[in-house]
Amino acid sequence: MFELFTALMLGILEGITEFLPVSSTGHLLIAEHWLGSRSDFFNIVIQAGAILAITFVFRKRVWSLATGLDKYSNRDYVMKLATAFLITAVVGLAVRKANWQLPETIQPIAWALIIGGIWILIAESVAKHLPERENVTWSVAIAVGLAQVVAGVFPGTSRSASTIFLAMLLGLSKRSAAAEFSFLVGIPTMFSASSYACFELFKRGELLHENWLEVSVAFVAAMLTGFAVVKWLLGYIKNHSFAPFAYYRIALGLVLLTWLT
């Protein structure tokens, strides 16, 4: 029963942190440090739950882009989404081939949380002095693609933080526009990464000993929580900055470093 409860808690944690600029991978690694580590498949599945949630949130936007390619603005936007995704895919595969491993200790995650928090504060400070723009440029698309790889390589960085705030610094200063592009790029990116990882685990026969009840509970928890969090966040950023998330990251990082010493 305790294992089922921890699976539920990890699913909720994934749903809360996946799309907030606080790093879901970092939080999961921290939680598993105390609750016990889970299989790669478990972590992949709960991330898939969060991805499904954001796909549902943006279903109308995705449909309008897919069915409106006769409009230049839609074609241009889709091409930039595709460019960001392809950059992530190519560079990400190269990193995977190099056998990059996630850290097994908390210290690098703590530092990534602190540095990421400072990064958010800098981006917010710079962006508020820029004219409000919501058009995605090619430089933003390329940078977002690379930022996704950085976030995957360094847990604690946060995919949403690295992509949203880099986009803001490069001129996409309207928070909602930067967040939308980040989230839409994240859909194919995370679906592809999850599918590839699942296929690799299947080939190695590592799916035979999973506790499917725990996996299912965590998946549903991540999906429902993720849906609620994204809906809340999209409303929140219309009139608020991301600064509170920055302070949270810095505080958590400092607490972890203090605990480690």
UniProtKB/Swiss-Prot annotation:
Under the GO molecular function aspect, what terms does this record hold? undecaprenyl-diphosphatase activity
Q: Which UniProt keywords apply?
A: Antibiotic resistance, Cell inner membrane, Cell membrane, Cell shape, Cell wall biogenesis/degradation, Hydrolase, Membrane, Peptidoglycan synthesis, Transmembrane, Transmembrane helix
What Pfam families has UniProt attached to this entry?
Answer: BacA
Catalytic activity, reaction form: di-trans,octa-cis-undecaprenyl diphosphate + H2O = di-trans,octa-cis-undecaprenyl phosphate + phosphate + H(+)
For this record, an example GO cellular component is:
plasma membrane
Subcellular location per UniProt equals: Cell inner membrane
A GO BP term here is: cell wall organization
Enzyme Commission code: 3.6.1.27
Q: Which residues cross the membrane?
A: 38-58, 75-95, 106-126, 136-156, 181-201, 217-237, 241-261
Report how it sits in the membrane. Multi-pass membrane protein
Record flagged with keyword Repeat:
no
In terms of superkingdom, the source organism counts as Bacteria
* Major subcellular site: membrane
NCBIfam families noted in UniProt:
PRK00281.1-4
Kindly give the HAMAP family that the UniProt entry links to this protein: Undec_diphosphatase (MF_01006)
The entry's function note states: Catalyzes the dephosphorylation of undecaprenyl diphosphate (UPP). Confers resistance to bacitracin.
Describe the family membership recorded for this protein in Swiss-Prot or TrEMBL. Belongs to the UppP family.
Q: Any additional notes?
A: Bacitracin is thought to be involved in the inhibition of peptidoglycan synthesis by sequestering undecaprenyl diphosphate, thereby reducing the pool of lipid carrier available.
Protein name, please?
A: Undecaprenyl-diphosphatase
Q: Which organism is it from?
A: Xylella fastidiosa (strain 9a5c)
High-level lineage: Bacteria, Pseudomonadati, Pseudomonadota, Gammaproteobacteria, Lysobacterales
